[in-house]
Amino acid sequence: MNKLFSKSFMPAMLCGMLCISVSCNSANSNSANTIEAENVANPTSKTVVKRKLAYYKAIRTTGAFDVYFTQTNKASSIRIEGAKEDVESVTWNIDKNGVLNIGQRTFDRNFFKGRNRHELKVYVASPDLIAITSTGAGDVKVVSALDTDVLRIEQKGAGDVEFEKPLICDQLFVSLYGAGDADLNKVTAQTVQLELYGAGDMDVNSLRAEKADIKLQGAGDIDVKLDKAGTVNSTLYGVGTIELEGTVNAVNVKRFGSGNIDTSKLRVMTGQRPR
């Protein structure tokens, strides 16, 4: 082999092999249309993985990372940002029911030791969202306005579910189990069901609905600001607190235990007293 050719060929070949290795390490086992990845040798440096996804309409998370959802009129997608080791631990797939399942391949108590779990972020987008199920320690944040027919939210872990922008839907169901929190900014719906079991907190900054059923069982807190709502039924079991304020057409309260249902800031527009 020509020596000049050998000297120029070998570095190029090694560079090509290195680039192929980096791309393979970045890939997840799930099928995808496109991949963009940037990996570096230092496992604590930032890595970004982007992929287009097939259509999905629900999210289920199990892991110690934060998920940010955006409703879009474009194709569904996922983007993961964080340290290389953390990013490569994230797994995802879309099941036959259209649920995007996001988890971690190697999660244990010491996985984020010495690092902030909030530095691992998963950004997802889809035209529709009808359900959120979270069983991990991370947060799920809906960062865009959301318009949907039916939305079911289930939080079974220690993380939070947060809506930063208005939510419009026909039916809304929110269930919290454990120590997690739910924060909804502005909700407009026909019927709403809010349930809290445990020691978590639920806050609805503004709720306008024809009918709302609110139930608390445990030591948690539910705070709801009502905006010209229809009928509100509130039931409390245990030592928790339900606080209702704003304006409604009718309200019914039932309390079992030593907890408190505070209606001192609630105005019933028909002149009816809370009962």
PLM segments and residue spans:
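Acidic (Asp/Glu) and glycine-rich low-complexity loops/linkers
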Residues: 4-9, 24-135, 139-155, 164-173, ...
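Generic hydrophobic alpha-helical membrane-segment signal
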Residues: 11-13, 51, 145, 166, ...
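Bacterial N-terminal signal peptides
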Residues: 11-21
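Short helix-to-loop capping/linker segments positioned immediately adjacent to catalytic or ligand/cofactor-binding
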Residues: 139-142, 159-163, 179-184, 201-203, ...
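Short, surface-exposed interaction patches in beta-rich subdomains
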Residues: 171, 182-275
